Design a protein with these regions (language model features):
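Unchanged
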Residues: 75-175
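Charged phosphate-binding loop/patch that engages nucleotide di/tri-phosphates or the phosphate backbone
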Residues: 168-199
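Short, Lys/Arg-enriched N-terminal segments with co-localized hydrophobic residues
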Residues: 23-34
Length: 199
């Protein structure tokens, strides 16, 4: 009890602790700088999420007004498989879980197409110094209907299901719009298997 009262009421003890904390923080400051988020890997995915009727999901970015897009995201590690990147980003940005009962793993299809583009200036600080180009791999994800979406509010603030041409017109990025406009051809070449069946 005496020790408790001493710690609670002794101003000198509080001052020493405060000074120690400030001195310790000063010594750790260089290390804290080094522990910042690592640079983004300049290799990413774009996932066009659509229904059998070719309605397409587009989501609105939180950091840019009127910037609508499909799901996108970079690899977490250099050796991360692109399909894993795609599934992770879909779950993080929309709440849609690939491998669930109504969205089987086979619904995610690698379109075997990639583009390289110049990174927008406002995003260059996220990459290592000197990195100005990103390679993007395109995927399609067919869902059974216009499913409800749970956004990550830090990244996106709104979403819409639109006919594919309207979705393409709303996209900020020309390459994203191009991917969506290719949807009729790409979707028609796929055989969407019933859940539980295999090729």
């Amino acid at each position: 009890m005496r020790l408790f009262r001493f710690l609670r009421y002794s101003r000198s003890t509080c001052c020493v602790l405060g000074d120690d904390a400030r001195r310790t923080r000063g010594r750790l400051a260089p290390y804290e700088t080094k522990m910042t988020k690592p640079p983004k890997i300049p290799e990413s995915v774009l996932v066009v999420i659509y229904t059998p009727e070719l309605d397409v999901l587009v989501i609105k970015r939180a950091d840019q007004p009127d910037f609508w897009q499909s799901v996108t995201g970079s690899k977490d590690t250099l050796d991360e498989p692109l399909a894993v990147t795609a599934a992770r980003e879909v779950a993080e940005e929309t709440g849609i879980v690939i491998g669930a009962a109504d969205v089987p793993a086979a619904a995610l299809v690698d379109w075997q197409h990639r583009i390289e583009y110049t990174i927008y200036p406002q995003y260059l600080h996220r990459y290592a110094p000197g990195v100005t180009r990103n390679t993007e791999h395109w995927f399609g994800l067919c869902v059974p209907r216009r499913v409800d979406v749970t956004l990550s509010p830090r990244e996106h603030v709104d979403y819409a299901w639109l006919p594919y041409r309207d979705a393409a017109a709303r996209c900020f990025s020309p390459s994203n719009a191009d991917a969506i406009l290719q949807l009729p051809v790409r979707a028609s070449s796929l055989v969407h298997l019933p859940h539980g069946s295999s090729a």
